[in-house]
Every structure is written in C-alpha cells, then in structure tokens.
C-alpha cells in the first residue's frame, strides 16, 4: 500500500479533488479518502498531515458528517476547509449556526497575525467563499489569524497543535494565494517535493506487470489523450500481452476514425484492431432523448463490443480504461460528493463480463496525464489534444441522435476548430466544440424566411476540467465562426456562444 504525504478526507465538496491536485502540482502526494474512513486505514497510509474538505452538510444537523475521533489524537497537522473548518470549531466546543449573510464568491482576506501558514501571502488578498453556515465564537485554545468583511473568524488556528481552519477554499483558482497557503501547510507537515510523473510511470509499469502476469489486456482507445496515454503505458509494461481495440461508434468527428488508426499504427507503433460498430450504436440510440440513458446505452454497448472481441483472443482477463480522477468525482465514487452526472467509464463492469478492470489513470488528474504522456514519449500534438468525451457527439446533440443531426454537428464542429487553429486560439483553450440544440429559430436568408437549427459554440479555459470559465474569444473570431457555419452548413441559421462557467454549468451540455 502506497503511503500518502497528506490525506484529504472528503466531506462532499465538488472541489475536494482540487485540493489533492494543487498539492501534487507542488510535488506532494495527496490522496483522497472518504470522511468516515477508519483510523486504522488512515494510520496504514502513514500520512504527515490531514486535510478536512468542504461539504454540503451542516455540523449541527442530524445527518452531519463526522470523521473518526482518532484523527484529532494522531498528533498530525490538520487543515480544515469550509465544512472542515466548522467541524474543527464544533469539535472544540465552538458554536456553529446558519449564517445571517451567506457568502458565495470572492471576498477580501485580511491577515491579522503573521505565521508560517501565511509565508509569502500579502496582508490583503482575494479568496473564494462558498458557505451558508458560520462559526460564531473562537474555539478554546485557538486564535484568529485572518478575517473578512463577513467573517470575523475567517482563519483561526491552534499553532501549538498545528490545527488550522479556513472558511474559504484555497484550492480554487479564484483564491489568489491559495496555492501558497497549501504549500505552506505541506511544509508545516514536513512534506518534501518527491511526487512526479517519472516515478509514477515506473511504479505503475511494475504494478501492471505484477497484476497481469501472463494474461492479456484489452485496451479500448478513442484517440483522445486519456486512452492514448493508457495504451502507451501498457505498451511499456506488457507489449506482448496488449490488445488495442478502436471502436468506431458512429459518434466521432469528421475523419476521426481514420486519424485514430493512423496515430496508433504510425506514431505509436501499436497493432490496432479497428471495429466499425456505428450501425449498432445508432440503432440502440434511436428514439432516446434522455442524456443519462444515452450515456448508459453507449457505455453498455462499448462493453458488449469489447467483450465480443476479447473472446476471439485467449487469456484475455483485463479491460483497460482511461478513467481519471475528474470522472470519479463527478460520478461521486469518493466520499459523499453529490452526483453531477454519470460517466461512461465509471462504476465498474457488469457481472456478466468475464474480465476485470485496469484503470492506471484513475487517481491522477488531466494535467498529470499530459505530463505522463510526454514522459512516455508521446508527441505534443497527441498529448495536448482537446478532451473528447467517450460518448462522443451523442452528448453534444440535444435530444435524439440520428445521422442527419450528426452530419450537421460535424460540419459546424470542423469550422469552429479550423477557425480556432488558424487564429492561434486552439492551443490557448482547454476545450472547444459545437452543440446542436435541436431547436429551430426563424431567420432570413436572401428574401426567404428560414426556420432551421441553432448551434451553440462552447469554448472554455481550464487547467483540469474541475472548474472552467468561458473563453474570451475576440469578437472578430466569433463572427467568422458564425458567418462560416451559417453560410456553409445547410440547415443551420443561428449561432450562439455559451458564456456559462463551471460551476454552475458543466463543460458538456449533457
């Protein structure tokens, strides 16, 4: 069992895994565990510090979440964030109650006492609040380190016991010096910067070899970053026992199937088995409008196709997937985070399947996956491709998926990507795609009235996909995209731009 420098106990915040990501960026290996994990399991990880995450519950409620009491008797530094802060206060006898003024968004943090936790942090900085409860009194043995306009006890601590409590979220990018504070906490814990993708690759290769033995692994690839890195990692570990399969589900972008085959065969040197199952997928999606049903159908059909292919080969015991940490958090596998949406590659395999899962990327973030890809020798054009969802264009078409709607979306999507690349904006953004709204609107083309489809452009900036902001594209670029799509794609007469951030919206529409 791998030791963790810092354990993050998950009380249900959608930001929880950002805490681990921020620490890992600084070379500190942080691992998530459910809030109710046993003290024995915590001790087995031999952590140097513990972080209590935020969460949607209230410490005074009947259904409040509490961690094992032993957490506070280990003698380790503890950092409580938001709900974790209120839990620290509650456990030390302070009153926590509903706030008269809820705080959501940016706030000014004012430091009133300097200490190691605030090393490198200015006296006043912007932090990100997201809470509806308030600590009304200072716990015994603690002192105030910082306040905000609406929070007298915004940061308090017991410096002797190294217990720190923050009302805000340092892990969110909007907190200007949040990274610095987390780095300082890691130093207080005595952590060193030893976590990197080079060491991860070596350990993962060895773990894969030990697990697989003489059995074979069926690796599903889509051409996206995640599956490409999984295939490369497995090729390093078990080149003779690896079967790489690409399924054309009929939900890919223009020429994508051909590009995937060329990439794996020519650039990665992988013997790729290509299966055209487009008719099967589209037939099963016929008449289906609900996004969750679409995801489930696509996921189940993928598994079925892979299982059929696996039976053609002897000793196939495992199926490899590119499941990431962000997939897990949005499907609420860890801790008590509330479900946002299911992911096609999260949740295990059906009982009828005859092989087990291998998910070597399950505990790392997208930025770590990219660094791992470079470490494994993949080219930058592969590693820095925009993310593309497993369910493909099916979740970028509102409502029913059919060949005509797919064709419209493909044509619009090509134009968007062409314009972004020619203007130099493609590499500046995290993800860019079109959404076919399946909503008609009135237009005028020439002297004729039209009543045709509207398409939405979705372009976002992000570092890990956990949070995202819409890209501030130049108006001229947006105008070019709109003009070309309307003029070149028959059946579309309106283009809109999505200016929603995540949260509250998700990046994909379905």
Curated annotation (Swiss-Prot):
SUPFAM superfamilies associated with the record: Adenine nucleotide alpha hydrolases-like, Class I glutamine amidotransferase-like, GMP synthetase C-terminal dimerisation domain
MF term (GO), any: ATP binding
Active site as annotated: 82, 169, 171
Keywords assigned: ATP-binding, Glutamine amidotransferase, GMP biosynthesis, Ligase, Nucleotide-binding, Purine biosynthesis
Superkingdom assignment: Bacteria
InterPro entries in UniProt: Class_I_gatase-like, GATASE, GMP_synth_C, GMP_synth_GATase, GMP_synthase, GMPS_ATP_PPase_dom, NAD/GMP_synthase, Rossmann-like_a/b/a_fold
Associated pathway: Purine metabolism; GMP biosynthesis; GMP from XMP (L-Gln route): step 1/1
GO CC, alphabetical: cytosol
Pfam family, one: NAD_synthase
Residue ranges of domain Glutamine amidotransferase type-1 in the record: 5-194
UniProt-annotated binding residues for ATP: 222-228
Record bears the keyword Amino-acid biosynthesis: no
Enzyme's top EC category: ligase
EC number(s) from the headed UniProt entry: 6.3.5.2
GMPS ATP-PPase domain segment(s): 195-385
Reaction(s) this enzyme catalyzes, per UniProt: XMP + L-glutamine + ATP + H2O = GMP + L-glutamate + AMP + diphosphate + 2 H(+)
NCBIfam families per the UniProt record, alphabetical: guaA_Cterm, guaA_Nterm, PRK00074.1
Subunit structure: Homodimer.
Function: Catalyzes the synthesis of GMP from XMP.
Name of the protein this chain belongs to: GMP synthase [glutamine-hydrolyzing]
